[in-house]
Amino acid sequence: MAKLHDYYKDEVVNKLMTEFNYNSVMQVPRVEKITLNMGVGEAIADKKLLDNAAADLTAISGQKPLITKARKSVAGFKIRQGYPIGCKVTLRGERMWEFFERLITIAVPRIRDFRGLSAKSFDGRGNYSMGVREQIIFPEIDYDKVDRVRGLDITITTTAKSDEEGRALLAAFDFPFRK
């Protein structure tokens, strides 16, 4: 079992129960899933770019990504409905906790000019979204084999009812918020 999951059960639950005066352990917010999304708009011209992006996402997450397709045609972007334009992975359970631990301890500190993550990126329901400009911050990606630097979106979905509860949950994991 991931260390962070044990830490959540042993420390975070008790801390949040006293902070928010919950009656039951089941009321305490928890991390439900982590979604990684990589939009590859250039895949319209070159299909190989999408394969490389999917390989990067597989290395980062340890799970095969789902190829996302355009929902509707947009002439300005030169895409048609059904064109493959990106890939995404939804992590749950053990893989989610392992990725979350790597994200906090290894990947985020490797971001260039890092001063902390914005605490305003919550969606109103306790879920946190962040963008990463380059995939090379993850140790699984070999810098020499990268054909193109791509960014990705990371969404941490929690069972929190409000942004305040979600922020407290992530802060309990020492999430590096900007002061």
From Swiss-Prot:
PROSITE patterns attached to this UniProt entry: RIBOSOMAL_L5 (PS00358)
Keyword Ribosomal protein: yes
One GO process term, biological-process aspect: translation
GO CC annotations on file: cytosolic large ribosomal subunit
InterPro entries tied to this protein: Ribosomal_uL5 (IPR002132), Ribosomal_uL5_bac-type (IPR020930), Ribosomal_uL5_C (IPR031309), Ribosomal_uL5_CS (IPR020929), Ribosomal_uL5_dom_sf (IPR022803), Ribosomal_uL5_N (IPR031310)
Record Pfam families: Ribosomal_L5, Ribosomal_L5_C
Domain of life (superkingdom): Bacteria
Sorted UniProt keywords: Ribonucleoprotein, Ribosomal protein, RNA-binding, rRNA-binding, tRNA-binding
UniProt GO molecular function: RNA binding; rRNA binding; structural constituent of ribosome; tRNA binding
Quaternary structure annotation from Swiss-Prot or TrEMBL: Part of the 50S ribosomal subunit; part of the 5S rRNA/L5/L18/L25 subcomplex. Contacts the 5S rRNA and the P site tRNA. Forms a bridge to the 30S subunit in the 70S ribosome.
Family: Belongs to the universal ribosomal protein uL5 family.
NCBIfam families documented for this protein: PRK00010.1
Role, per record: This is one of the proteins that bind and probably mediate the attachment of the 5S RNA into the large ribosomal subunit, where it forms part of the central protuberance. In the 70S ribosome it contacts protein S13 of the 30S subunit (bridge B1b), connecting the 2 subunits; this bridge is implicated in subunit movement. Contacts the P site tRNA; the 5S rRNA and some of its associated proteins might help stabilize positioning of ribosome-bound tRNAs.
Protein name: Large ribosomal subunit protein uL5
Taxon lineage: Bacteria, Pseudomonadati, Pseudomonadota, Gammaproteobacteria, Enterobacterales
